[in-house]
C-alpha cells in the first residue's frame, strides 16, 4: 500500500518487499511475454515447414522429396465396386 504523508506530500510504500515474481507480473508484461512466445512458435513452425519435411536426414533421393503422392491411390485401386472402362483396360 502506498502512503502519502499529508504534511510533506511524500509517498512511501508500506508493503513488505516481496520476492514473488507473480506479484509483480502485470497484464501488460504478461501479454508481452505471451506475444514473444507466440512469435517464436510461429517462426519455428515456418522454418520446419519450409525445410521440405526432411529433418530426419537419411538417404532419400532429392527428387522424391518434391513429388506429390496421392494418398488415395492404393485405396482407389483396391476398390472392388469401381468398374470403369479405364480400369478394365488395365
Swiss-Prot record:
Lineage from the top down?
A: Viruses, Viruses incertae sedis, Naldaviricetes, Lefavirales, Baculoviridae
State where it is primarily located.
Answer: virion
Q: Where in the cell is it found?
A: Virion membrane
Detail the disulphide connectivity of this chain as listed in its UniProt entry: none
Cite the entry's keywords alphabetically: Membrane, Transmembrane, Transmembrane helix, Viral envelope protein, Virion
Please report the name of this protein according to its UniProt entry. Answer: Protein E18
Additional facts recorded? Initially termed ODV-18 since it was found only in occluded viruses. New approaches also found the protein in budded virus. It has therefore been renamed to E18.
Residue ranges annotated as transmembrane are: 27-47
Q: Which residues form the signal peptide?
A: none
